[in-house]
Curated annotation (Swiss-Prot):
Reported function: Tryptophan 6-hydroxylase; part of the fragmented gene cluster that mediates the biosynthesis of fusarochromene, a tryptophan-derived metabolite closely related to a group of mycotoxins including fusarochromanone. Within the pathway, fscE hydroxalates the first intermediate D-tryptophan to yield 6-hydroxytryptophan. The first step of the pathway is the epimerization of L-tryptophan to D-tryptophan in the presence of the NRPS-like tryptophan epimerase fscC. D-tryptophan is subsequently hydroxylated by the tryptophan 6-hydroxylase fscE to yield 6-hydroxytryptophan.
Protein name: Tryptophan 6-hydroxylase fscE
CDD domains in UniProt: CYP58-like
Membrane topology: Single-pass membrane protein
Entry's localization field: Membrane
Major location category of this protein: membrane
Species the sequence originates in: Fusarium equiseti
Pathway: Secondary metabolite biosynthesis
Keywords carried by this UniProt record: Heme, Iron, Membrane, Metal-binding, Monooxygenase, Oxidoreductase, Transmembrane, Transmembrane helix
Amino acid sequence: MVSSLNNLGVLLPIEGVIILVFVLSCFSLAIKRLYFSPLAKFPGPKLAALTMWYEFYYDVVKRGNYFRQIAKMHDQYGPVVRINPFELHVNDPTFYPILYSSSTKKRDKWSWAAGMFGNNTSVFSTVPHDHHRIRRAALNPLFSRTAIKQLEPTIKCQMHELSRRLDSFCESGMVLDLGLAFTVFAADVISAYCFGEPFGLLQDPDFAPEWVETVAAPSELGHLIKQFPWALGLFRLLPRSLIGVISPAIVRLYTIQEWMSLNVQSLISKRHDDHSSSAKSCVFEALLRSKLPASEKTVDRLKGEGQTLIGAGTLTTANVLKHVVFHTLDNPDRLHALAAELEAEFPDPNEDVSLDRLERLPLLTAYIKEALRLGYGVTHRLQLLADEPLHCNGMIIPPRTPVGMTSIFMHDDPTVFPNPREFDPDRWLGEVEDRRHLERCFVPFSKGTRMCLGMHLAWAEIYIVIATVFRSYSFQLHDTDRSHIEMAHDFFDPAPKLDSKGLRVTVQRK
């Protein structure tokens, strides 16, 4: 008994010292972040400057809602705000080309944010500017305007498959989620280009909803991965069944990574088995033939690239297609005007659409641009680090400071886009100088050296799909309003309200 009391007397002071050291450490860290950090001079909420838990609450607990809090910060503090202990956010259109520079100035990614999808081997997640330039250079020719023109038959092949599926709904009269159909269409296009064969998701009777959930899972999960990057490695040590109980989204992320590994490994094996030039040309075949060093051609490296290309080439394109269709169907005058332009250009209903001719149609282009504006592209802020000090609104941003901007704020700026929440294609049909002013704030694909690789592919898919469906079919919205398609959550990609039923329509052949 006496021995136990003596031990207790020893433990209590030790525990007290540990607690005291912890409290003093937290206090000193708080003082450093609030008053002695290089970012201490920048305005913003003290709690945001103090801890990353502030962002965690809004993006993880409140599920992709930090962008709304950042908007409130700008309303209160101005165009440059400190949104966490290490990062600044800017809401000033004139600063966009400075941050997302296309010049020779280097822009590294912020490593904390770059790995948010659980891989660090893709072009998207590459942190150093020079390393990114090497990886991007191998992909740029494959996604150039010229290369995508040559891909037009592949896009049309999948469009024919989508039309076949729409015809089946014409016959049955059943309601379909057109957004889901658009998602698997985009997935089949990008998979055909990446791997030489489409995934065949359009052939699934229900448009492969579980696959779509799997591909979308890393988007929301990214908020959690940023905060706890070590968690993915820890979860890999657990049985898959247990992980599924804790987080089904993590299981889906592991599934897609394993799936990409199998696809890449299969392509490499086929390439080794077929040394002739008859092997199908595709993105990964081209990467394997490229001058990239061997370290850039491993299965693990290309797996990460595949995950990014499939995800990026699927979700954002489908989102824009949903916006074009919904806003066109929601206004009979718009529907009539677009149909008239398409009929004038292609009077023969059996004539195949041509991408070259579609790109010259002003009204169709205006509809797509307005859908891109309201769809935002990527909604999450894209942080970059400059080697030099940056000047913004009379403030000097220290070198190597993570700085981000957001397409939402650019596209919703009422000084540039009057009535910004309205779908108004006419704004893109004004005078040349007026359109140039809009273009400067039009950033669905971002800008600079880190801009979206698949921009030309997305444009081509959207042109072909919209022209084809509105030439050949009549749609009726079914229990669908704007809230089912407009952005409500920032899961890196824009996501509608959580109980959205999608873009539900009935369809008939014209």
